[in-house]
Amino acid sequence: MNDIRNTAVPADVKQPEGLPAEDEFFGRMNDPTAAASIKGVCGDEMEFYLVIRDDRIEQVRYHTNGCANTSSCGRAVARRARGRNVTDALSISAGEIIRSGECEPAAGRHCAILAVTTLYRAIADYLLAP
């Protein structure tokens, strides 16, 4: 996996179609404390960027090239993760995201799993850092 933590954000990055313009969590982040990127079985890619201080997630952003449902799941996960202790954020589940009504339950199962798994990997990036 490439280290996406040190990748500059291109100026022409646009939000995916169908994503609300007011999504404060969408976009890449320069110099995060931790980051992760995963490509799902459907071909959608999800990235999470975290700024962590004293084991608390102070800032979180996600980026995806996926469908509106993938974006909705990324937003739902990011909103739940912000402000939480890193170990507490590991309790966010795909089932919780699906039950929240923030994504299409039938089509969104794999989207929710992709979003949550990417968050988990970003947290692991933080916890396992030297």
What are these regions (language model features)?
Residues T64-C73:
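Short, thiol/selenol-centered motifs that function as redox-active sites or metal-ligating centers
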Residues S37-V41:
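Short Gly/Pro-enriched turn/cap motifs at secondary-structure boundaries
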Residues D44-D54:
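Short beta-strand elements
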